[in-house]
Amino acid sequence: MDSAACAAAATPVPALALALAPDLAQAPLALPGLLSPSCLLSSGQEVNGSERGTCLWRPWLSSTNDSPRQMRKLVDLAAGGATAAEVTKAESKFHHPVRLFWPKSRSFDYLYSAGEILLQNFPVQATINLYEDSDSEEEEEDEEQEDEEEK
């Protein structure tokens, strides 16, 4: 099902609305896919033997219609006059979902200022995942020893 079919599947516009605003008769009043349950479930897979189209774009799912990823171009910094930071930001391509790994020992730093600075300097939609590092394991062992001493 393509986007035109999704638009056709949406509920029809009442005649009174068309009479009041004839210019709107040519454009749909609702977004395609919002009113059609078949478009809501679409991601290109087969469900109940019928192939669904792609009405909603999901960046984490690749489809056959996607163009191949372009290779990063080599940029001559001297000729372009751009700094390395500007080139990195302009030429970088991210594969979503982006996951940033943050040590559990620094989780309180994230809650206050360091996490805010991290997200300002990394301006893409990303998920921060906490991981066990040597510092956080030592803290857990210290807490366990303190608990044992209290008993």
Swiss-Prot record:
Residues 132-151 have a biased composition (Acidic residues). Residues 96-131 are annotated as: Ripply homology domain. GO terms for cellular component: nucleus. It holds the Pfam family Ripply. Residues 130-151 are annotated as: Disordered. It comes from the Eukaryota. It is found in: Nucleus. Belongs to the ripply family. Plays a role in somitogenesis. Essential for transcriptional repression of the segmental patterning genes, thus terminating the segmentation program in the presomitic mesoderm, and also required for the maintenance of rostrocaudal polarity in somites. The ripply homology domain is required for transcriptional repression. The WRPW motif is required for binding to TLE/GROUCHO proteins. This is Protein ripply1. It comes from Homo sapiens. The gene is RIPPLY1.
